[in-house]
Amino acid sequence: MVLPDLAFTFTTDRGVFSHGHLDSGTAFLLQQAPSPPTEGTFVDVGCGAGPIALTLALRSPEATVVAVDPNSRARELTAANATANEVSVTVVHPDNVPADMTVDLIWSNPPIRIGKQALRELLTEWLGRLSDHGVAILVINRNLGADSLHRWLETESWHVSRLGSRSGFRLLSVSRPHD
C-alpha cells in the first residue's frame, strides 16, 4: 500500500473487511486526516486487516497504537501485518480493552453495516473513552448515513466538524465540547 508519506505491505483475507484491496473510504481517511500527534494512545476501532492501525504506528512510532476488532481473523491479520512492517501495534478483542482506558486519538472506518443502533452503541462506547482533548476521525459513506450520523453525534453533545468529502465519503472530526 502506498500513501504520499508511506509505503508498506499488508495481507488481507476473505471474511475480513475490504478483502484484496484498500477500500476507498479508508484510503480517503489515510490521505486526508490531520497528521496524528507524535505520542499518545491511539485506537483503530474495527481494524480489519489493519491499514489504519499500521499507518498510525508508522506515522507516530512513539504512540501506543491499539487495533480493536471482534473478528479473530482480522486480529490475526493486523498482528501479522504489524510484524511484517516492523511496527508496534497492540491487537485486541473489544471485550479485552481495559474499562478505564482513555484514548487521545481514534481513527476509524466504523462498521456501518452492523445497523444504526449497534453503531450508535459502538460509537458511544469508544467516543466516551476520548481524553479531554482527544479526537476521533471517522470516515463514513454518505449513502450509508454519514449526514444523519453527524446530526446524531451533535444531538449527543459531541463537537462534530466535517473535514472533507470525496467520492461519496465524509471525513468527520469528533471531540468533546469545550466551554
Locations of the language-model features?
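Short beta->alpha hinge that forms the Motif I/post-I loop of the SAM-binding pocket
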Residues: 69-73, 118, 141
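Class I S-adenosyl-L-methionine
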Residues: 145-179
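Glycine-rich phosphate-binding "P-loop"
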Residues: 105-117
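SAM-dependent Rossmann-like transferase core, predominantly class I methyltransferases
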Residues: 1-39
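Short "lid" loop at the C-terminus of a central beta-strand within the Rossmann-like core
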Residues: 112-114, 141-146
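Conserved SAM/SAH cofactor-binding pocket of Class I
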Residues: 24-108
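Conserved beta-strand signature within the Rossmann-like core of class I S-adenosyl-L-methionine
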Residues: 133-140
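A short glycine-rich, Lys/Arg-flanked "PGG" loop and its adjoining helix->strand segment in the class I
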Residues: 120-132
